[in-house]
Design a protein with these regions (language model features):
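Cleavable N-terminal export/targeting peptides
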Residues: 1-32
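Subset of outer-membrane beta-barrel
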Residues: 20-349
Length: 349
């Protein structure tokens, strides 16, 4: 049952096709809803965002970015990853950040993902009714400067995933709760050698395996590492142009457990490990409408070799005084990603 729901989730994320849902490294992980990236701005730029993260979504992408915040900010997102295949699957995210002069900045976030209706059956396949499975994560983030151009950040997470409405789930000859709880941490680094160049890295979802049936069958968290660069080659009083790129490596390893961020680099052949890497690139052109208002055009590309995805992305953004609104679109004709729009809103004060 756990594997069926995991496959469904990864289909909804577009990380693999229906026939290959169990073939990706990420599909071995529990709490894979944590891989739903919340920002429409990031999505429009191919999800290359670890070296940007200049809004409350930094609590998800890179907590080190919080160090540069000087105002309170709020970000929210709600979207349906596969509206053509399962309209009851949705993901929502909200975050709030608060600056504290001289000691660093705090952030708080929540992610809730409905995995839709599931059918509960007994060992013989007889129907026992329907239920809605879901995943939820709560995070507290902190970011501060080590030096003028170097910042670090950390996020502590509480994670819960409920895959059954029964507290007595049977898988083969074994029984379990059908729900799991765990804790994890994210770690971020951001370096700005000059005002227009940023280099950043983030290690996310570092924590122990999550148990649903018993400890021997516990599944790893979706640990991953991202290295990114953002550069502004052009900027004047009215407009600017930003380019960014990320390299993403999934690291879940059932045998590695908590230390998957170490063992996840070498638990397969070098060729397979290399194919696990995703490449993301994005660009943003922003035009200032006034001192506090702007319009943005965005485009990107996401290359996921093992998931068989090569997806162009696009989007728009509008900033008006204290509020922002962003929309993104995956330019993909596959059943999983066709007509996937993502909307985000936020404000600062």
């Amino acid at each position: 049952m756990k594997k069926v729901l995991s496959s469904l989730l990864f289909l909804s994320m577009g990380l693999s096709s229906m026939g290959r849902a169990d073939a990706t490294t990420e599909s071995t992980a529990a709490a894979s809803f944590l891989l739903f990236e919340p920002s429409a701005r990031a999505s429009a730029m191919g999800n290359a965002y670890v070296a940007i993260a200049d809004d409350a979504n930094a609590t998800y992408y890179n907590p080190a970015a919080l160090a540069d915040f000087n105002r309170r900010s709020v970000s929210t997102t709600f979207y349906k990853p596969v509206p053509n295949l399962a309209s009851d699957i949705f993901s929502s995210f909200a975050a709030y950040t608060h600056p504290f002069q001289g000691i660093g900045n705090l952030g708080f976030s929540i992610i809730y993902t409905s995995l839709g209706k599931q059918f509960h059956t007994d060992a013989q396949g007889n129907s026992l009714g329907e239920f809605t499975s879901f995943g939820m994560g709560l995070g507290v983030s902190y970011g501060t400067h080590l030096f003028k151009n170097l910042s670090v950040g950390v996020t502590a997470k509480f994670i819960h995933e409920n895959l059954s409405n029964s507290s007595n789930v049977q898988v083969g000859d074994e029984r379990g709760k059908g729900a799991g709880t765990s804790f994890a941490g994210d770690f971020g680094l951001m370096w700005k050698p000059q005002s227009r160049l940023t280099v950043a890295a983030a290690l996310r979802n570092v924590g122990p395996n999550m148990t649903f049936i018993d400890a021997d069958q516990a599944d790893p968290l979706p640990q991953n590492f991202t290295l990114g660069v953002a550069f502004v080659p052009y900027k004047n009083d009215k407009s600017s142009f930003l380019i960014t790129t990320d390299i993403y490596k999934p690291l879940p390893d059932r045998d590695g457990g908590f230390f998957s961020f170490v063992t996840g680099w070498t638990n397969d052949t070098p060729d397979a490990e290399f194919k696990d890497i995703d490449y993301k690139i994005g660009a943003e052109w922003q035009y200032m409408l006034s001192e506090e208002s702007a319009f943005a055009l965005r485009a990107g590309y996401w290359h996921d070799e093992d998931g068989k995805r090569k997806v162009p992305t696009a989007g728009l953004g509008l900033k008006y005084n204290w509020a922002t609104f962003d929309i993104s679109y995956f330019i993909d004709n596959s059943a999983a990603l066709r007509n996937v729009f993502r909307f985000s809103g936020g404000f600062h004060f």
